[in-house]
From Swiss-Prot:
Entry's family note: Belongs to the UPF0415 family.
Record-given protein name: UPF0415 protein C7orf25 homolog
Start and end residues of each stretch annotated as Disordered: 200-236
S-S pairs: none
Organism the protein comes from: Danio rerio (Zebrafish)
Record's compositionally biased regions (Acidic residues): 200-234
Length: 427
């Protein structure tokens, strides 16, 4: 009966977690990258549990208590506690100190990309034992994993700042481990528990069996079971976790300090959007061109200029020579009197700099989405360590697919329409 009740509870939790993921994503107001992957893992876990329920798979009750669901639940709870979640189970590529190409799974990327979270559901006892070299062969300690996170984060800056790392513990963490993580610059969330010295080096009685059923689950959990030979800090005195003595309970940091980038590089698409007649109230038209009618409808639904102004406020504004020259050509060809007047006012606020694409930008391979003009504009922004404002999301995605991620502010596009209003139908 106990096994049956435990099984039913785990099935209920799996179903609830799927519903909670939907709520998290709807709260963000945008699609959360990795949602399908997380839901896939939850469904795989649910399917496995339902096989156990149907008698197709036989496992011990202790294994039910320590399924992959523990880690998946920790990920969901972390995402629920954070703002501006952009992705879950995101895989970042980086190079290890010896030059080897590595990948790292970040459970939750939040705060618009500025915060990386590793969610840990394993018990404090097991984590502490592994750290002291008393785990199973191949177990990788949390401290070693923290080193990987630091290495990867330094190679994945967001707006030219390294992401802030949080390790979220949902079954406690020993006080010495928490102290070590803090020394490394990593924030800790969860209950910090005391440790006691083990007389005569006796072993820990309680073994954490998390993941024992993993080979039975169709989709392997890849977030928390990193394996690597690890025996760091072997000179530590053997200690036992005292779960009953909680030293501190730490919540997620409410305010993560982010170094704000005060330099902005304007793409041609932004220059056009900023001066467009559509952006200045003249959006109540049906144009002959379908794309202009669509942009007018978007503008009536959500004005783009306030977003641009808010982002640009108090920042140093730049544009490269190529962007300005091509903008002027487009303006001379398609711009109306009001648009041209606003353009002169905007250009007077900018510091125009020579094209100076960064080294990594020049390594990009040309394609339909990656052209020379975009390389000059985004590459110059990269050299300036500025955030490039753009409506050219196609280039941003294409560059990211080649491993180059630019710091960008993406907005909806608006075309120059003043010269076409005379033959448009007012609405």
């Amino acid at each position: 009966m106990a096994t049956y009740n435990t099984l039913q509870d785990r099935i209920r939790v799996a179903k609830e977690l799927l519903e909670r993921v939907d709520k998290i994503c709807s709260r963000q107001g945008r699609e959360v990258e990795g949602r399908a992957k997380l839901c896939g893992k939850l469904r795989a876990e649910l399917k496995f549990l339902q096989k156990v329920e149907a008698g197709k798979v036989v496992i011990k009750e202790s294994h039910l208590q320590s399924t992959n669901l523990t880690h998946l639940k920790a990920i969901v709870e972390s995402a629920e506690s954070l703002e501006k979640v952009v992705s879950v189970l995101h895989v970042f590529a980086y190079e290890s100190p010896d030059g080897q190409k590595q990948t790292l799974v970040v459970d939750v990327v939040a705060n618009g990309g500025h915060t990386w979270v590793k969610s840990i559901g394993r018990k404090a006892e097991a984590l502490h034992n592994i750290w002291q070299g008393r785990g199973q062969y191949g177990d990788k300690s949390v401290i070693r994993q923290a080193e990987d996170f630091l290495e990867a984060s330094q190679q994945q800056p967001v707006q030219y700042s390294n992401p802030h790392i949080i390790f979220a513990f949902y079954n406690g963490v020993s006080s010495p481990m928490a102290d070590k993580l803090k020394e490394m610059g990593i924030s800790v969330r969860g209950d910090i528990v005391a440790v006691n010295t083990i007389e005569g080096g006796e072993e820990e009685d309680e073994e954490d069996q998390e993941g024992d059923h993993e080979d039975l689950v169709e989709e392997e959990e890849d977030g928390e079971d990193d394996n690597d030979d690890d025996s760091d800090d072997t000179d530590l005195m053997h200690t036992r976790v005292d779960r009953d003595t909680i030293v501190a309970s730490l919540a997620f940091p409410t305010e993560v300090k982010v170094d704000v980038c005060n330099r902005v590089n304007l793409d041609i698409t932004t220059l056009i959007t900023y001066v467009s007649s559509l952006s200045h109230g003249n959006c109540h038209f049906t144009f002959k061109e379908v794309v202009l009618t669509e942009q007018a409808a978007q503008e009536r639904q959500e004005k783009v200029l306030p977003r641009l102004e808010e982002f640009m406020k108090g920042k140093e504004l730049f544009a490269c020579q190529s962007a300005v020259e091509d903008f002027r050509v487009i303006l001379d060809t398609l711009g109306g009197p009001g648009e041209k007047s606003r353009a002169e006012e905007l250009l007077a606020r900018l510091k125009v700099v020579p094209d100076q694409p960064s080294e990594r930008t020049q390594r990009l391979v040309m394609s339909s989405k990656v052209n020379r003009r975009s390389l000059m504009i985004f590459g110059t922004g990269d050299t300036l360590r500025a955030i490039t404002m753009t409506a050219n999301s196609g280039f941003v995605r294409a560059a990211a697919n080649q491993g180059v991620r630019f710091s960008v502010f993406i907005h909806q596009p608006r075309a120059l329409t003043e010269g076409k209003e005379w033959r448009a139908t007012p609405i």
